[in-house]
Amino acid sequence: PEELDEDEFDNPLGEGTGAGVIFGATGGVMEAALRSAYYLVTGNNPDADAFQSVRGLEGWKEASFDLNGTTINVAVASGLGNTRRLVNAIKKGEVHYDFVEIMSCPGGCINGGGQPYKEDAVMVEERRHVLYGLDKRDNLRFSHENPSVKQCYEEYFEKPLSHRAHEILHVK
C-alpha cells in the first residue's frame, strides 16, 4: 500500500469559540451577542462573565445592561408556552426589549429532541454547566474574535454593521 505524508486535518467548519458553545443553553445566544455588542460599542472586551444574569432555566427572564451609557433591555424565553406569553406581552405593549432570545426547548438545545430524554431538571442543569465550563476553558470566548468570522468580514462583509452585512445577515 502507498504511504501518505502526514498532514494536518482540514477544518471544514472553521474554528469555534466559547461563545458558540454556550448557544446550546438558554441565554447563551444572548450572552454571546452581548459580549460582542459590548466590544462593538466600547472597543474593549467585557469580562466574559459580565452578562451571566441571562443564564438559567427560568421560562422568561429579563435583564438590563449599560453599554457605554446606553441601556439595553433584553429578554430570554425558554419553551413555547413562555414564548407565547412573551410575544403576547410585546404585542400588547406591556414590555419593550431591544433584543429577545427564544429557545423552543426548555433549557435550550441541551434539552432538545436530539438529546437523550430525561425528565428531571438535574440533567439539563448538568449539561448547561458543562457548556459554560467549556466556554470558560476556551482560549477564544468572544464571537467577534473567531478567526473564521473575522475572515468573512475582512473578505466579504467589509466590517461588522456594514451595509452589505446588514442586507445579507439581518432579517426584517
Regions from the language model: what does each represent?
Residues P1-K172:
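Iron-sulfur (Fe-S) cluster-binding modules
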